[in-house]
């Protein structure tokens, strides 16, 4: 397990939660392709040195799928990752109609266990356009390799990862393990981000509450089954076609 985690997590100065979704085993015996799809905290924090690290590892991102709200995107420069033109920025807000409420976002980020899972399920109800846009892009091989991300890489990114991995036939145990790999930013990184965003540095004191707790994802997955029946039913309700779902599987699975 340790070797897998080391291979999955990319050590970068700007982003603490940049990792590869490759290697997870699907129920049909296939595995998720390595170096094809990544999840992360906001790519705006990547440094020039980080880009060199990615290049040295043979990682070239064709696209970045930004799950943040319009307010978050407008608040700060999109980052050096997009400056060269090699990586295209695609804005796919997870909740386009309500995410500018910072207090509500903080409440969601800090909740754990059953409350955290229920919060996730409420947010999911607004995410149909996001999933439709993301799956349409992942079904197009020319839009890969890519990374999707929110602010911290935990909540919105965690929900997208759960739905995506379920689509690929990955077990709930592996999905929960992937969620739990998400680490809270270091205090130094948090303080730097708060300063760059013009936010209250005292928010950095909540580092412990920003960690990803497995029980939150457990409750989310159980509630997802209760509300939606299956991942296919959920995706179809987002107006994602069966052929699109199958192309996503073909692009992201091997073996």
Language-model features: locations:
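Cys-dependent protein tyrosine phosphatase-like superfamily
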Residues: 1-147, 159-255
């Amino acid at each position: 397990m340790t070797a897998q985690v080391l291979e999955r997590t990319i050590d970068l100065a700007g982003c603490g939660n940049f990792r590869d979704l490759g290697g997870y085993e699907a129920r049909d015996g296939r595995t998720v392709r390595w170096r094809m799809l990544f999840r992360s905290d906001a790519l705006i924090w990547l440094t020039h040195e980080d880009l060199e690290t990615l290049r040295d590892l043979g990682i070239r991102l064709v696209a970045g799928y930004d799950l943040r709200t319009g307010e978050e995107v407008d608040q700060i420069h999109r980052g050096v990752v997009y400056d060269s033109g090699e990586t295209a920025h695609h804005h796919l807000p997870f909740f386009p109609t309500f995410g500018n409420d910072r207090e509500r976002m903080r409440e969601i980020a800090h909740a754990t266990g059953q409350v955290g899972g229920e919060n996730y399920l409420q947010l999911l109800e607004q995410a149909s356009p996001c999933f439709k846009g993301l799956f349409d892009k992942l079904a197009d091989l020319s839009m890969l390799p890519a990374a999707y991300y929110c602010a911290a890489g935990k909540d919105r990114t965690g929900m997208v990862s759960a739905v995506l991995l379920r689509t690929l036939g990955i077990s709930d145990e592996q999905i929960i393990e992937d969620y739990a790999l998400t680490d809270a930013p270091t205090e130094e990184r948090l303080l730097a981000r708060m300063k760059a965003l013009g936010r209250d540095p005292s928010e950095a004191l909540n580092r412990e509450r920003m960690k990803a707790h497995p029980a939150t994802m457990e409750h989310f997955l159980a509630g997802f089954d209760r509300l939606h029946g299956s991942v296919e039913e959920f995706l179809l309700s987002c107006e994602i076609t069966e052929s699109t779902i199958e192309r996503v599987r073909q692009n992201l699975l091997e073996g």
